[in-house]
Amino acid sequence: MKGFRSFIDRYALIIAMVIGVFGWRWFRHLGWLTSPLIFLMLFFTFCKINPLDLRLRRWHFIVLAVQLALVLGVLGIGYWILAIGDGQLDIGVVLQGLVLCLIMPTATAAPIIAGKLGGSIQNLTTFTLLSNLLTALVVPGLFPVLNPSTDIAFFSAMWQILCRVTPLLILPFLCAWVVRLVYEGYHRRKGTVRRFTLNRTWASMPFYLWILLLVVLMARITDTLLNVVYEGWMIGVMCGGALVACILQFALGRWIGYRFPADSHGADFQDILINPSAVNYTLAEKSRITAGQAFGQKNTALGIWMAQM
């Protein structure tokens, strides 16, 4: 059983993608599971955070600032190309895709993956919360700009998106906090002090929910590609742009983490539990791994959900 679980953990990404691609006829109809699965992924991720114990790092703010700068830069370059092209270059879809690649929050499974690589689960979980909060605040203002409509005013479109996006990002955090307060309050009334923690199985739950969701998403992506209305060169440009954005974010994240490492010593208990060798990593090594995953690992499920709104 342990060997089977290790195999699934190692090759889960490939297995999920293959199942989703070849089983697209069946799994494409499970799109309604997207929102509940995203909610649960965020809920279990936030359950690992005690809001009173949040530790902010320098690289948290630097990564967020660079992320926003890249988004604004892509928007500026995109609109400049549209202007000089005199409306002949249709790059609106490419522009939307690039912005989504950049602005999407960190994947909920990223802390688990970072832990397996030797990074800091604590620091990345904290950044995941910050990243989701940033997305909830920024995305509603970006979408009306990326997809302007003559029928809906800017602030009306912004409000509609805010009502759809923010609850999915904020409610899991609030629910996790309520569960923690109720659990710890119950034990205090009994005269005992017990902190709310997740065991290894429940702490890994976002990873397995992500795998399940990835199957559904790959099925829907396959269905979309088979019925695509764009020309081949346009698809190539979108894929190339996404690849460049992915490599750039991983590289920048790793550089920022190495250049501005966390200022605390030692390894978190969860890090050692998942990867015993993490205790031997230096602060710079742990921060490089953690920041790289924080910037490069994106919540693809949330991005596709937003793109289909």
Model regions and ranges:
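Alpha-helical transmembrane segments of multi-pass small-molecule/ion transporters
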Residues: 1-309
